[in-house]
């Protein structure tokens, strides 16, 4: 005991010495006096533990407490006119009261979504509802000290969506159907329009957005500059021509039907967007990304992703919120930024990227962990820069992949990124499925199904004619048209923005929303049926094989891609 007393006494003496520079004389005398008298039994005030607490109280005052903060406060935000005071309703999950009420009434039936609800757990989750019925989930609770916070709701939602996506993929794979359908249907089942296992979608959709980023990054790794030059004219000029034709057709139709011209132009721009994620996922499953029709389709899809920013700049003009001149200036600025971004990316491709990858290979001689992390970081940095410049995350991630594809480490990088891509791609496709309201589709299945058939026929015909104009054979043209026949997931964002700007009316909004959702569900089945139909003997003379084109230049294009694939 004497040895432990000496050790404790020495520790406290050293602590007192370190505090002497900031402590007054009276505190030191009281501190050391208590240490000397600490051996007196029964003296609670003079115990070492009590003294240690008083020293800590003196050292760390209330003003020194580092409170957890998000960098803003209520008073300062209102004073700086960064926020406005508004009445909200706070929804708390009081477990005791709720259980007592249920036991007394005995009327609340069991609901399956309660199994996945966090309301029965000792959770501090809080929900706020404003006067416009907007729902907000608290993400950063004020705390006296900085603590590690865990969002149990997000963890639960991710577990649900990943498990159901896996089940859906397994079931449809066993049935010989595309797993994309399984992902989409799994999302629709667990989403707000289904069994409501997931009701707060913002956080899940944000995490799932990485699926598109990594999907296009991996696509860029396979989509080399040589292939880009082969399909460049049809991708850029053909993609632009397809958008213009749809906008013109819908605009004329709107005028003939007595609707507003701006509404018709928006519908045409809306319908021109195709789903990059769904199409690319299908091409990857069929190992068709290197085929000629796959390259043409991917080129047009990438061009559409570039045009998304221009369409957002066009919406205020169509809504009458800004003049035509202002809209033209906004589009011109975006084109200038895009040119600068691509120029800088080209310079980095030949100067920085090869040296960077060689360094990562040297540092990753023992394990690929550092190389994998560096590749993901490079992809995310490029996507983030593109988004900050007013372009899109998708364009930035694709450009990052193309930059790395010019090096000898492209295949190695693809192997490292593929597992991450597959996980987040399934997560993203399932999150798209959560936007699909099964009850809404079923209640209006007749008009929505007719709309989907009309959209598929029109988009397939226009895309096939455009590709055929660039002297591709009928099989390739029709195949590309079918692949581009659906409406893309970015149409949901475009549609929401147009509704806020009053470009379209409520009924048209619901029609386009349901048509988009149903087209995404039926597209994978269409992908599976149409190619099989084209291989029927009676149709072979209308749809010859890709390599049987009578045009010599097309044969050179196909052979160039094949040679490049063998040497890559």
From Swiss-Prot:
Localization (cell): Golgi apparatus membrane; Golgi apparatus, trans-Golgi network membrane; Prevacuolar compartment membrane; Endomembrane system
Primary localisation category: Golgi
Any one Gene Ontology molecular-function term assigned to this protein's record: potassium:proton antiporter activity
Presence of keyword DNA-binding: no
Induction: Up-regulated by osmotic stress.
pH dependence of activity: Optimum pH is 5.8.
Transmembrane segments: 154-174, 178-198, 201-221, 230-250, 264-284, 298-318, 334-354, 389-409, 422-442, 447-467, 476-496, 510-530
GO CC list: Golgi membrane
Reactions that this protein is recorded to catalyse: K(+)(in) + H(+)(out) = K(+)(out) + H(+)(in)
KO phenotype (gene knockout): No visible phenotype. The triple mutant kea4 kea5 kea6 is compromised in cell wall biosynthesis and has a reduced growth, small rosettes and short seedlings, and is sensitive to low potassium K(+) availability and to high salinity (e.g. K(+), NaCl and LiCl); it also exhibits a reduced luminal pH in the Golgi, trans-Golgi network, prevacuolar compartment and vacuole. These phenotypes are partially suppressed by the cell wall-derived pectin homogalacturonan trigalacturonic GalA(3) in the dark but not in light conditions.
Cystine bridges: none
Recorded topology in the membrane: Multi-pass membrane protein
Any Pfam family: Na_H_Exchanger
UniProt keyword annotations, A-Z: Antiport, Golgi apparatus, Ion transport, Membrane, Potassium, Potassium transport, Signal, Transmembrane, Transmembrane helix, Transport
Segments for region (Disordered): 59-78
Domain of life: Eukaryota
Summary of the function given for this chain in its UniProt record: Electroneutral K(+)/H(+) efflux antiporter involved in K(+) homeostasis and osmotic adjustment. Together with KEA4 and KEA6, promotes growth and development, and facilitates endosomal pH and ions homeostasis, as well as salt tolerance (e.g. K(+), NaCl and LiCl), probably by supporting cell wall biosynthesis during rapid etiolated seedling growth.
Name recorded for this polypeptide: K(+) efflux antiporter 5
